[in-house]
Amino acid sequence: MESPLGSDLARLVRIWRALIDHRLKPLELTQTHWVTLHNIHQLPPDQSQIQLAKAIGIEQPSLVRTLDQLEEKGLISRQTCASDRRAKRIKLTEKAEPLISEMEAVINKTRAEILHGISAEELEQLITLIAKLEHNIIELQAKG
């Protein structure tokens, strides 16, 4: 019998994301907000929306919706790039800085709880297998 690996992985991502959403709700944030803010925080300053979308691995229209929400919350600012008026540079606001620490604490605690009972060796094996799957998929996409 064939393993429903794709379905299993999709379900795992869905329930993991739902748990993160639930845990971030007191901060009025979602997993998508966290991923975006985390990447803005990690990347060099004044990244463009295009660079941020690539770093996160999503399409620009999806990112724009999230950035709109974060801007409404006062957590980011977007400025038109002087060298390319079509491009927007993204920066965290002062309001976002303390929130980053709170979010990271929630994420780290949740991750530790999810991985409870999994040895470092098992986790390393899982990471290696996921990397192999990703590599195979990227190669297949390149072939068309």
From Swiss-Prot:
Lineage top rank: taxon: Bacteria
Keywords: Activator, DNA-binding, Repressor, Transcription, Transcription regulation, Virulence
UniProt key word Transcription regulation: yes
DNA-binding stretch(es), residue numbering of this chain: 49-72
HTH marR-type domain location: 2-135
GO terms, biological process: negative regulation of DNA-templated transcription initiation; positive regulation of DNA-templated transcription; positive regulation of DNA-templated transcription initiation; regulation of DNA-templated transcription; response to stress
Claim: Repressor is one of the keywords in the record: yes
GO molecular function terms noted in the UniProt entry: DNA binding; DNA-binding transcription factor activity
Database matches in Pfam families: MarR
Role of this protein: Transcription regulator that can specifically activate or repress expression of target genes. Activates expression of genes such as molecular chaperones (groL, groS, dnaK, grpE, and cbpA), proteins involved in acid resistance (hdeA, hdeB, and gadA), the starvation lipoprotein slp, virulence protein hlyE/clyA. Represses expression of genes involved in the histidine biosynthetic pathway such as hisA, hisB, hisD, hisF and hisG. Required for the activation of virulence genes.
Assembly with partners or alone: Homodimer.
Family indicated by similarity: Belongs to the SlyA family.
HAMAP family: HTH_type_SlyA (MF_01819)
PANTHER family the record matches: TRANSCRIPTIONAL REGULATOR SLYA, TRANSCRIPTIONAL REGULATOR, MARR FAMILY
Protein name: Transcriptional regulator SlyA
